[in-house]
Regions:
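PDZ/PDZ-like domain segments forming the peptide/carboxylate-binding groove
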Residues: 53-104, 205-206
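Sec-exported extracytoplasmic/periplasmic mature domains
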Residues: 1, 11-22, 31-42, 79, ...
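Extended, small/polar residue-biased N-terminal targeting/export presequences
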Residues: 1-71, 135-141, 146-188
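C-terminal "post-core" interaction segments
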Residues: 175-422
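PDZ domains, with a preference for the canonical peptide-binding region formed by the helix
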Residues: 18-22, 93-143, 250, 345-348, ...
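Extracytoplasmic/secreted proteins, especially bacterial periplasmic and envelope-associated proteins
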Residues: 5-12, 16, 25-32, 36, ...
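Envelope-exposed proteins and targeting segments
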Residues: 58-60, 68-73, 90, 138-140, ...
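A mature extracytoplasmic/lumenal domain signature
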Residues: 32, 48, 66-68, 76-79, ...
Length: 422
């Protein structure tokens, strides 16, 4: 939507909220407005839990998932919850919600309180999360059909206070956005079949003030890959699901463990305040200063390189520089990306912000990542973007129920992909 149209739509909403001193309405308008940017680096902080409680504090003891065949099914039904009390069982197909065909109800679900939705896949995911949320005490009429039953049932469910339980269960934001700092930024292990597994939380070093292993993150990663090389592993899984991003240079340095030749990682294209124009500069990540105009960031040829099959596990919570790990692996001769959906699609340079009335702050990116042809890469446009799987894992009922029960379906498919490349 053009800026003038956005202003025309949201300025009156903000003006009414100001006139009536309705902070909840102002906060929701601010979130809806920033969501139109469709970038994971555009956010409103902090989360206003008063608004969350008022708008989405009630749940129905229900989590739903959309299958590849278009059906919306129950993948978690809380014992003793409203849905279970109405006779709904795991795998039940939701036919209607709040008197509307579920497809329409889903499309009309407000996701103002969700994280940003750069891609269409993320939009649908967030609509599924908030479809089953409502103010406490709200009644919703639902038509559903349990597996094995010949006819559907109709029930009225009442939203109950649940401590935002289902929102917490389905929160797919990046790791550092939703939890405490880990004890180390890189974890490694050897899986059955002599497969190396390494998980990267983010491309930053653990702060010295935080408890844990303060070995530099790059060193931890190189130690892991070098140990796999020495052990002659049959393949490597690099898990960047919900990776929070960080340093682009660190990602390029990670990739040296897989690249025999110097390869462009990106050109960083920044808006120069003095001119308002984009220019390619290499940034000093420690000082924030722009150095080396026109220069790109390169993956240097590694001194010790793994050349066997590599798989990157991704989800939509993998954001920013974390997406660069998936991109670098996908570009390898024996590299594949595995996941139900692609990465977040937010690959620009983040860091700018502005303070807003009522104590809120809006963050946004100020630079672009360009490929060798100096075209924006990975960032979402028109709802499409991110680093996509070579072949998406099918969201079947069986897979959806496995995921909901805690089974690592993505790793299972990742191991299959490795075996196919051996």
């Amino acid at each position: 939507m053009p800026p003038a149209a956005l202003y025309k739509k949201y300025q009156p909403i903000v003006a009414r909220a100001q006139a009536s001193k309705d902070q909840n309405a102002y906060y929701l308008a601010l979130r809806e407005y920033t969501h139109t940017m469709r970038d994971g680096h555009v956010s409103v902080k902090p989360d206003d839990m008063t608004v969350y409680q008022a708008v989405a504090g009630g749940g129905f003891g229900l989590v739903v998932t959309k299958l590849d065949n278009g059906q919306v099914v129950a993948t978690w039904v809380k014992d003793g919850g409203p849905a279970a009390a109405a006779g709904m069982k795991l795998g039940a197909q939701i036919v209607k919600w709040d008197g509307k065909p579920v497809k329409i109800a889903l499309a009309q679900t407000s996701i103002a309180l969700s994280p940003p939705q750069p891609t269409n896949a993320r939009t649908v995911y967030e609509q599924l999360r908030f479809l089953v949320r409502a103010p406490v005490g709200t009644d919703k009429t639902v038509v559903f059909k349990n597996q094995g039953e010949s006819s559907s049932r109709t029930a009225t469910l009442k939203a109950v206070e649940d401590g935002m339980e289902t929102l917490a269960m389905t929160d797919s934001r990046s790791a550092l956005s939703k939890g405490p700092l880990p004890e180390k930024m890189v974890e490694q292990k050897t899986l059955p079949g002599n497969i190396g597994y390494v998980r990267i939380v983010c491309e930053l070093d653990l702060p010295q003030a935080a408890p844990g292993d303060h070995t530099p993150t790059l060193e931890l990663f190189r130690q892991a890959i070098n140990s796999f090389i020495d052990s002659k592993v049959a393949g490597i899984v690099v898990d960047v699901r919900s990776n929070s991003g960080g340093s682009d240079q660190m990602v390029a340095d990670f990739m040296s463990s897989f690249y025999k030749e110097k390869t462009l990682y990106e050109y960083a294209n920044f808006v120069v305040p003095a001119t308002g124009q984009f220019e390619i500069w290499k940034e000093n990540e420690k000082t924030g200063e722009y150095v080396s105009p026109g220069q790109g960031t390169y993956i240097q040829a590694g001194s010790k390189v793994y050349t066997g099959p590599v798989v990157a596990l991704v989800n939509n919570g993998c954001i920013s520089s974390g997406e660069g790990v998936a991109m670098g692996i996908k570009n390898l001769p024996k590299g594949k990306v595995v996941g139900f959906y692609g990465t977040n699609g937010s690959f620009g340079m983040a860091g700018d912000s502005v303070k807003m009335p009522a104590g809120y702050e809006v963050d946004w990116p100020f630079g672009q990542s360009l490929d060798k042809n100096k075209v924006v890469q990975v960032d979402s446009k028109g709802g499409k973007g991110g680093v996509l799987p070579n072949k998406s894992i099918p969201m079947t009922l069986d897979n959806a129920l496995k995921v909901a029960s805690g089974h690592d379906v993505e790793l299972e498919y990742g191991l299959k992909a490795l075996n196919q490349m051996r």
